């Protein structure tokens, strides 16, 4: 497929065409995802759980991330590579610049950080230095201990109002994209309409500009044997991984995934 850039993603939002994203951690799956038409490969710190076997993303290092970004780059064929800055790798200006340099030099096209409006300054800092930033809002796994577990965020009106305001503030600070995780579908739709930048959802309904899932989840692979409510097993009834990936792309583009059963209400 032709190279996907930030301009491509902005154009897809403007045209109302859904953006497809999956996590990806190695060259073989990068190639396979590209063959299926996946537009964004997220090298997520979720690798700490699905590859390394940890119970959270917190142990993942910048070196771990750089290793997997470089692997994905070698197998990539046109997708935009989005990479997570891991836990506490952007706590200070010096850390943010050093960590970002490592991941961009390894092959990332955009970096993702987790939080809310307090990230406005890091977003500005990185944007001014040529690093596009996606901000992950809602359920932010790096702060799971503060949130008290993996829970839906933005269910009460004050939280929802704050999340809408934060999204607008982050866009004004220069964020290139937002990712909403485990947010009520109606709130996610409102935020998507309120900003001009692309908004990707996971457990956030089907009115966002695109969707993302963890690769292992959508292939029915789980260490715990359980899947989150927002996951669909695309391997079910398929005879190949390629067919499962293609089905995911087709269903996201057709807005048949996610269905109402995969979302959350306020």
Curated annotation (Swiss-Prot):
Homodecamer; pentamer of dimers. One of its GO terms (molecular function) is 3-methyl-2-oxobutanoate hydroxymethyltransferase activity. It catalyses: 3-methyl-2-oxobutanoate + (6R)-5,10-methylene-5,6,7,8-tetrahydrofolate + H2O = 2-dehydropantoate + (6S)-5,6,7,8-tetrahydrofolate. Its EC number is 2.1.2.11. The active site is at residue 181. One of its GO terms (cellular component) is cytoplasm. Mg(2+) binds at residues 45, 84, 114. Belongs to the PanB family. SUPFAM superfamilies: Phosphoenolpyruvate/pyruvate domain. Binds 1 Mg(2+) ion per subunit. The lineage of its organism: Bacteria, Pseudomonadati, Pseudomonadota, Gammaproteobacteria, Pseudomonadales. It is found in: Cytoplasm. One of its GO terms (biological process) is pantothenate biosynthetic process. This is 3-methyl-2-oxobutanoate hydroxymethyltransferase 2. Catalyzes the reversible reaction in which hydroxymethyl group from 5,10-methylenetetrahydrofolate is transferred onto alpha-ketoisovalerate to form ketopantoate.
């Amino acid at each position: 497929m032709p190279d996907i850039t930030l301009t491509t993603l902005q154009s897809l939002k403007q045209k109302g065409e859904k953006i497809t994203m999956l996590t990806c951690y190695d060259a073989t799956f990068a190639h396979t995802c590209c063959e299926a038409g996946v537009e964004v490969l997220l090298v997520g710190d979720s690798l700490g759980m699905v590859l390394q076997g940890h119970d959270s993303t917190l142990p993942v290092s910048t070196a771990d991330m750089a290793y997997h970004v470089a692997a994905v780059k070698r197998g990539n064929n046109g997708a935009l590579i989005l990479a997570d800055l891991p836990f506490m790798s952007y706590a200070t200006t010096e850390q943010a610049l050093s960590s970002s340099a490592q991941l961009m030099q390894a092959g990332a096209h955009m970096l993702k950080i987790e939080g809310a409006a307090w990230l406005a300054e890091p977003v500005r800092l990185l944007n001014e230095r040529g690093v596009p930033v996606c901000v992950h809002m809602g359920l932010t796994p790096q702060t799971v201990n503060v949130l008290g577990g993996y829970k839906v965020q933005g269910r009460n009106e004050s939280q929802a109002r704050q999340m809408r305001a934060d999204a607008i503030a982050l866009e004004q600070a220069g964020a290139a994209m937002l990712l909403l995780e485990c947010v009520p579908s109606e709130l996610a739709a409102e935020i998507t309409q309120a900003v001009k930048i692309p908004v990707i959802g996971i457990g956030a309904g089907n009115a966002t500009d695109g969707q993302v899932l963890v690769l292992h989840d959508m292939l029915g692979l789980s260490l715990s044997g359980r899947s989150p409510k927002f996951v669909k097993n695309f391997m079910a009834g398929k005879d190949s991984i390629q067919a499962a990936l293609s089905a995911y792309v087709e269903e996201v583009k057709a807005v048949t995934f996610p269905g109402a059963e995969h979302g959350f209400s306020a």
